[in-house]
Amino acid sequence: MTDLAILHVCSPNIGEAQILSVVNAAKALCGYLSVFVIGTSAVPPIGAHVSNVSVPWMKERQRDQAQIDKTVRELEGFLAGTGIPYNVESAYTEVFSVDNEVDRRARLADLVMIGADLLGDQNTLEAVLDGAWFHADVPVLFDPAASLVFDNPTVMIAWQETAEASSAVRASVPLLKLAGSVHIVIVDDNRDLRDPAPGLLSYLSSRGVENLSAEVVPRNDRLVTHVLDDHAERVGANLVVMGAYGHARLREWVFGGVTRSVVQHLTRPTFMAR
């Protein structure tokens, strides 16, 4: 049995399948669920023509706030019948303040969950991840298609001997203990194939994670994300666990990297920590 504090960050346009998946996660992990509905507003008009645009801007804000309030009421009504402990909060702010809003609510959370609604809003998503990863230092579980499985799922761990990958593994143990099988994959052209990840296998076994396997997969000049996608497909992974931002965040933002590519092309539930 686990007892996690789960923070689900969503937009006012959250779908029914998404909230059902979050509730299932809270039930499976015996968790307390906090839902944070975040709406982003346009920057207030400034300059010589403020009087010409302020009325439309105010009307847009009123419409947005009304939608947020409606979503909060609907979520509270739905969650009241689920039998799980919960609370619902909301905020309406400019996108450059989203990271701080998420940080305040995520500091005492064990896990942040994000669904399809935010994955389709790149600016808000980046601000939410900034608040979760770089301010609150909390792992994030992405559920792009509301397809999380908690009844003996197949889990793939993308393993590197880095602090970020280690953090992801430690934080995901409650999920790994629910797994029917856990496949550890190491993407490396030069790694010894005979005894991959003995330390990780020992650690997971000591935590009660069962049905473990590990293998090294060569990169062969392919992108790491493609190698991981192919392997996840081959083993039928319902969930991928991996570290986030092994390189400097600025470097990944400028040049791209595994974390950025994975987040931009998510197709299956993915647990990431740094």
Regions found by a protein language model. Name each.
Residues 1-56, 135-138, 150-218, 237:
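Small/aliphatic-rich secondary-structure junction motif
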Residues 18-19, 98, 125, 165-168, ...:
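Amphipathic coiled-coil/heptad-repeat helices and related helical stalk/stem segments
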Residues 19, 26-28, 101-148, 231-274:
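Gly/Ser-rich helix-loop-strand patches that form or flank binding pockets
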Residues 33, 40, 77-112, 207-240, ...:
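Structural beta-alpha unit
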Residues 38-41, 93, 117-118, 145-147, ...:
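Short, ordered loop/turn segments at secondary-structure junctions
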Residues 55-70:
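A short acidic, glycine-rich active-site loop
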